């Protein structure tokens, strides 16, 4: 219904295409031009940083910002197709942006960081406390001088969706699948309540589905499930020293894991 308006801004806009659902941080609609803006708590220097890898003879995205690029690329993939289904007779143009802090700009407001303070509830949840005059101060800053601004990643997103970057051939990144096949397979697995296939490696040691030592025994642990299936043992019950416990900048943990040394 909101999309029938000529110009409108929508926060947390939801789009559904087949089995894929996304919530876009900010949708800016100007006629038939849709600006898709994903806000990230990350700083970026356009004078020094690049969205693409600086390695010679390779066409790949910068690994430091790759998760963010694939996040917004997936959102664009869903939004473009959802709009075609919802408005078959309309022709929308979708542009993708990452909203980040620009390290090349100097703040024009003293104490800008004090306008938004991170607080913690008694339950341990974090929230942002906004100063009463924050909006007045922030909106008074000219667009050309704002520290937080949108960076155009539209072309990079299109190339990601088209499978043009080298990392999509990496078995450890997307199991060697191109973007479209990967997201379709992941959506199918999710709808069928099926655990997606994966390759174990040092990335597992920071797994977000890893149970903490003090958690209940009844809680599921995705990290242990994968290692039981792929390596044949439970890391929590293993008494021998594990690769994950080794410290050192130059220890090639993935090399050992590929050699079945865990």
Predicted regions and their residues:
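Low-complexity, intrinsically disordered regions enriched in charged/polar residues
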Residues: 4-5, 9, 173, 177
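Mg2+/Mn2+-dependent nuclease catalytic core
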Residues: 6, 11-159
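Cys/His-rich finger/ribbon microdomains and the adjacent scaffold used
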Residues: 113-262
């Amino acid at each position: 219904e909101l999309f029938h308006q000529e110009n409108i801004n929508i926060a947390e806009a939801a789009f559904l295409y087949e089995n894929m659902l996304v919530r876009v941080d900010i949708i800016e609609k100007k006629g038939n031009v849709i600006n898709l803006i994903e806000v990230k708590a990350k700083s970026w220097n356009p004078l020094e940083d690049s969205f693409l890898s600086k390695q010679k003879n390779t066409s790949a995205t910068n690994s430091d910002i790759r998760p963010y690029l694939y996040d917004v690329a997936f959102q664009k993939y869903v939004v473009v197709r959802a709009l075609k289904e919802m408005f078959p007779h309309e022709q929308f143009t979708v542009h993708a942006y990452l909203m980040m802090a620009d390290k090349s700009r100097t703040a024009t407001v003293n104490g800008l960081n004090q306008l938004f303070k991170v607080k913690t509830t008694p339950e341990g949840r974090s929230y942002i406390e906004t100063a009463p005059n924050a909006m007045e101060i922030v909106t008074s800053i000219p667009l050309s001088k704002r520290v937080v601004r949108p960076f155009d990643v539209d072309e990079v997103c299109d190339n990601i969706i088209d499978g043009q970057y080298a990392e999509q051939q990496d078995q450890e990144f997307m199991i060697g699948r191109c973007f479209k096949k990967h997201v379709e397979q992941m959506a199918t697995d999710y709808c069928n309540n099926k655990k997606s296939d994966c390759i174990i490696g040092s990335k597992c040691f920071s797994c977000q589905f890893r149970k903490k030592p003090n958690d209940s025994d009844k809680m599921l642990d995705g990290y242990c499930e994968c290692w039981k299936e792929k390596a044949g043992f439970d890391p929590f019950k293993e008494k021998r020293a594990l690769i994950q416990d080794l410290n050192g900048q130059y220890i090639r943990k993935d090399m050992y894991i590929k050699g079945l040394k865990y």
